[in-house]
Amino acid sequence: VYKRQRMPGKNVVILGSGDIGLIMARRMVLEGAKVQCVAELRPQSGGLKRNIVQCLDDFNIPLYLNTTVAQIHGRDRVEGVTLTKVDDNGKPIPGSEWEVPCDTLLLSCGLIPENELTRGLGADMDGKTGGPIVGENLECSIPGVFACGNVLHRP
């Protein structure tokens, strides 16, 4: 959105209230979108309190806790989503669904690294971080295979 100066849509629902989701809510508003809401599966936001205030409260964006996306509507593009409340186990609560019109669903849920490929290749893995062991140049124990980003650590 920022670099390419191109908006994916004008009416946004965000799933995930960690700091990245909160900051994206603010960025989308500043770029001219209407953020309908932020939905969070857990009973509390994963973001910093100041980000909740500066990114949601300051822009009157509702935060729905214990809530997830049950359905995405639309054929060629998103036309809306069905949100639903969830119980303590993260399971949808029947009868708690409601529809939110939107043309964009921004997913900001979990930065858990995907290490299946490096593990499957037989790379040496770090028991503490869950990611591959790398050298100074970020090369794994397999020559020519490099790692970066979230695979190097886990939240």
Regions found by a protein language model. Give the residues of each.
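Residues forming the flavin
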Residues: K3-P155
